[in-house]
Each structure stands twice: as C-alpha cells, then as structure tokens.
Regions:
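A sequence-level detector for low-complexity, Ser/Thr- and acidic-rich stretches
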Residues: 62-66, 70-80, 84, 105-106, ...
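Mature soluble binding/inhibitory domains
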Residues: 1-292
Length: 521
C-alpha cells in the first residue's frame, strides 16, 4: 500500500496492511529528504465496544509496551523502554518495572525504573490518556501520554502532544504459555532506528519459523546511505510471558501470537535507539490460476515478501492451479513448459520447474523499472497480476539445506564442499553460489548459461564480508554452464578468530544480504 503522508507534502508512505489484528504500518522509505519516520494506524472502536468508563474491556491487559522518545527533539535526550502495562482498578495502572536506557543517563547503559501510582483514562471512542508522573529528564518514562486503543483491544498506540515532545508508544496485548515455537508465522514489520551511524526508517516483513530465528526483509532509508534492501536473520529467545530478546533488542509477543513490538535495549548497543512493530500477514487465496501476491520470492534465500526481484534472478512463485502437473526443464530453459508461461512486465520468463503450487523461473535480463508485474498463464487461463519491487540486484546465497540460512553453498577451490567436516581456512580461496546479482557483461540470452571464455561478469560491484571483515574479491559473475546461477570467488580474510560457523554477507550498491554462514576452522 502506498499512502500520501498527512504531515509532509509530497512524501509517500511505504505501508503494509494487516487484517488480524487490523493495522496499517510503514515508513516513508522512498522520499529524498532527510526525514525519517514510522507510521502506525489502528481501527478505532465504536462507542458500544469501547465503553465509557475507565477500566473498560477495551483496555484489558497486560500489554507489552515499548517507547522511543526524543525529548526536545534532540538525540542527546533519546530514550528507549519496554515494560508491562496492565490496568488494575478503575483509572489506575498496576505498578510496574520499566527496562530501558537513555542517552543522558549512565552513558546509555540499560537501567530499570520502578513506576508506581500511574493512572489512565479511557473514552468511549478508544482515546484516552496515561500519566506516568511529573515529566523529568532523569526518568526513563514520565509525563502524560495520549492513548489510542484498537477496536479489538489487541493494540495500543500513543505519545505525548506536549510542545517539544517527540515520542512513540506501541503496545500489544500479552500472551501466556509462550515458547520459542509460539513465534511461528509471517508478519509485516516497520520501525525507526537512531544510532551513531545513521537514522533509519524501514518497512518490510518478517518470517518466524518457531525455531529461535527470524528472517527479515526490509526496505530501509538511511541517512547518508539512501534507500537499500536488507535481508537477514536474527536469533531470538522468548519467555513464557511473551517477552524476550532478538539479537540486540528486547521484544514482546502479543495479540495471540499475531503481533509483536521491540526496542533496542542492550549493554552491547548503548548508543542505539529503536522501536519496531509487526503484525501478522493476511491469509490470501484465490480460485482458478492464482498467484499469491505474497508468493514471489528469491529462489535461493526465500526471504520474506517485499524483497525485490532483479534481472537474471531465479525466483520462486507460489500459488494454486499454476500448472496441470509437475515438469522440469533442461538448459536452455524454455519460455513455455508443460503449457505454462510466466510473463514479467509482459515478457516471457525462462522456466526451470512448474507444478500446481510452485514455479521456478528466471527474470528476463531486460526487465527495467522500479516495479515489475508478474502473470502466470496456465494454458489459456491467466492468473491475477502481482506487482513486486524491482532492483538492480537482489542477492540471495544458496544454503546447503535449501532453507536460505545455515551453511551456504560454498566450495573449496578444488570444488569440494565447505562444510563442518571440511571447513574453510582463513586466507583460503572459496567459491560462493547465489542468484540475484543482476546484469552481466557480455550479456547472455535469457535462459542460457554463462560461458567460460569469455566469462560473463556481473556489472554490479560487490563486497563479501565474513564476520564483518571484507574478503578479497577474485570473480563476480555467472557460474559457467548454469543459467541464472551466479558465482563469487573470494580469498577469505586471514584474521578470522574463533572459527565455527561465521556469518557471510553480500553487499551491493542497493542491497545487503546476510542469511548464511561459512564453516571456518
């Protein structure tokens, strides 16, 4: 969803809509100015559902709440918190402990603050206020906040309207009996982050598989870096009450596991201040030949919806009724396979694999623009049209287990597999296999393999990082003999301490991909 900003003329919000719980979230990631934002909207309750008295059912906690504040509009006063918000008696909030940090308190180290005597009011339309005592720069949270409760009571948003205040509060109704496996769905996500390197607003999606790690796709707008696409993985650990950690952030899972909030509170990240919010993706289905609007993904990384496609990239399409049966093609890949054709911006895409629920195709090299339309033709029947972002590159490294994470598809120089049984050594040359590196020179025909003399090199510049250290680039282009498969040869950094599975990231001018590891001895 693209929305015109109500606050800035000409700014457009890169937004996402969720149906359960209902919310509209996003950030103005495509604007060229130096304004960075987070947008959250929720449906207001009717008078009959909200009630008119404090303590009504519209605010029935507990809730996991996070805040991001910039008192006076300056980062020197920045503060980030997480706490449990729960109504007690009419008009009173239960006493609670605030976890957080502030730039002007203890050098930004995490602190706790005991909150007693907090009160609230709630009106029939879901609006209200919460008072956390007299406003004070020495407190993690204080003063009065306006509150807005969603129609179903699952989400609360708010902030202060006092002159000079710049803050955001987001809360989700807490759940109980949580384990790591509870976080098992796909979500829209958006956030705002301030750290010494940049100010960043982002909008995207996240997939949690219940196995203590989540996959992120983010379109980010960062000060000094412009707009770029991030795909990566974060580990997490949840407590029984839904609170927990995700890498260097604190999170709270709520709304029956269908929404989450987060804030940057960690001793290892004391200069970062961030707030983010996620809501479950809607369930989409259709009749006949149906291509899921959420089902166009990078064939290597399987990054969540919203990640761009790029010219020459292997993509996977998910839906129903896409083909009458399963069939696989041999190179050069044809434009029609088993009666199925895929059109990308009205141009036929080479097909490797078709089945009723999945298609693997190559994006034509001539695909241009900022978005692309995709249509599946099964015989004489066309699917719905799906529009997806398009970028010069959208790197995704293949993984050994085909999940998009864990040990990557990486070979030693003798073409032996890099794995736990035969890890790579610091300073060794390795071969990395991926897709999504965009245009090559000399060009090749759609669906055909790259050659060996001459090699078809990627036009895009690339940096390979191992545990954050740059590797020495030797080759970046198509893997000879395999359509749509790219290969990057690097010499690993010589100073890789610790060994084990180290993160391997791919950085281009418009993208940063960080989902796989490389075993190092």
């Amino acid at each position: 969803v693209v929305l015109d900003s109500a606050l800035r003329t000409g700014a457009r919000i890169n937004a996402r809509y969720a149906a359960d719980p209902k919310a509209l979230i996003g950030s103005a990631t495509e604007t060229a100015d130096n304004t960075f934002d987070l947008f959250v909207a929720i449906p207001a309750p009717s008078a009959s559902s909200a009630g008119s008295a404090p303590g009504s059912a519209a605010l029935s906690g507990p809730y996991w709440a996070v805040t991001l504040e910039f008192p006076g509009g300056v980062t020197a006063n920045a503060r980030n918190t997480q706490f449990s918000l729960s109504p007690a008696a009419a008009g009173r909030l239960a006493d609670f402990s605030v976890m957080g940090h502030a730039a002007n308190i203890a050098q930004g180290l995490p602190q706790t603050q005991q909150m007693t005597g907090a009160t609230y009011t709630l009106n029939a339309d879901g609006t209200g206020t919460a008072s956390f005592g007299t406003a004070a720069a020495t407190q993690l949270i204080s003063g009065s906040k306006n509150l807005y409760v969603s129609a179903d009571g699952n989400v609360v948003i708010g902030g202060s309207v006092t002159t000079g205040s710049h803050d955001f509060l987001i809360a989700v109704k807490a759940v109980s009996g949580v384990t790591n496996a509870t976080w098992n769905n796909k979500f829209w996500g958006a956030g705002l982050r301030v750290d010494p390197n940049a100010v960043t607003g982002y909008s995207g999606s996240m997939a949690a598989g219940g196995a203590a790690k989540v996959y992120w796709t983010k379109r980010e707008k960062a000060m000094g870096a412009g707009v770029f696409d991030f795909t990566g993985i974060n580990g997490y650990s949840l407590n029984a009450d839904g609170s927990g950690t995700m890498e260097l952030t604190q999170v709270g899972l709520g709304a029956g596991g269908k929404a989450f909030v987060g804030s940057a509170i960690n001793r290892s990240d004391t200069a970062a201040y961030e707030i983010f919010f996620g809501v479950q993706l809607p369930a989409l289905s259709g009749s006949g030949v149906f291509l899921s609007p959420l089902g166009v993904v990078n064939a290597a990384s399987s990054a969540p919806p919203g990640n761009p496609i790029s010219p020459g990239q292997f993509i996977t399409l998910y839906g129903t009724g896409l083909a009458k049966s399963t069939q696989t093609a041999a190179p050069p890949y044809p434009a029609t396979l088993n009666g199925v054709t895929v059109l990308v911006n009205n141009k036929q895409a080479p097909l490797y694999f078709v089945s009723p629920g999945q298609i693997n195709a190559l994006v034509p090299y001539t695909t241009q623009g900022t978005t692309a339309t995709i249509v599946v033709q099964n015989g004489s029947v066309n699917s719905n049209t799906v529009t997806v972002p398009l970028a010069a590159t959208a790197p995704g490294v293949y993984s050994l287990d085909q999940s998009g994470s864990g040990p990557g598809a990486i070979l030693h120089a003798d073409f032996g597999l890099v794995n736990a049984g035969r890890p790579a050594a610091p300073g060794e040359t390795v071969l990395i296999y991926l897709t999504g590196m965009g245009a090559v020179a000399p060009a090749v025909a759609d669906g055909t393999a790259g050659g060996s003399n001459p090699l078809n090199k990627s036009v895009a510049d690339v940096v390979v990082l191992v545990a954050g250290q740059p590797a020495t680039l030797l080759y970046n282009g198509l893997a000879p003999g395999f359509p749509g498969l790219y290969q990057i040869n690097v010499t690993l950094p010589t100073l890789l301490s610790g060994g084990g599975n180290l993160p391997l990231a791919i950085q281009t001018n418009n993208a940063y991909h960080d989902q796989v590891d490389i075993p190092i001895r």
